[in-house]
Amino acid sequence: MAKHLLSKETYARLEAEVAELEHTVLPAVADKIGRAREMGDLSENGDYHAAKDEYGMLNDRKNLVQGILENSEIAPAPPAGEVAVLSVVTVLFAGDRPEDAETYLIGHIEEKRDGLEIMSPSSPIGSALLGHAEGDHVSVTLENGAKVSVTVTKVTN
């Protein structure tokens, strides 16, 4: 399986999230479950069931993030002017007006940046854009067989 490429900042944020979940959040919810259990009949104890559900969701998130980290490495700095993982790229789909250009961060969904949509580097369009530069026209065959063409109008690394 190919490794996920993450920025140093995202990798560190995810490590901190796992640590907080393991050492602070999950133990606090486990205590909440224990206190609710002491209230008696569990079949009608809403606090108990809510705390168990909360624990399950948080534990699932911890496991998901741990899996991402175990299968990730720090992305190298993108080459200047070339679309790579962690590039911010603006594209114009064929037939669209220039004001309809769309801007994306090429990267993992966990890269979350304010105001930027994420495009996976493993998606058909994301992978086709890798290695291209401003002004390049890129034709892509989508998973459903449809063909689209985009023009790279801006690359920021």
Where in this protein do the model-derived segments appear?
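Helix-rich terminal scaffold detector
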Residues: 1-24, 28-63
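Conserved NTP-handling cores and scaffolds of large molecular machines
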Residues: 18, 22-25, 69-73, 133
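Elongated periplasmic alpha-helical coiled-coil
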Residues: 37-39, 71-75
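Amphipathic alpha-helical coiled-coil segments
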Residues: 59-73
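Non-DNA-binding regulatory cores of transcription-related proteins
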Residues: 75-157
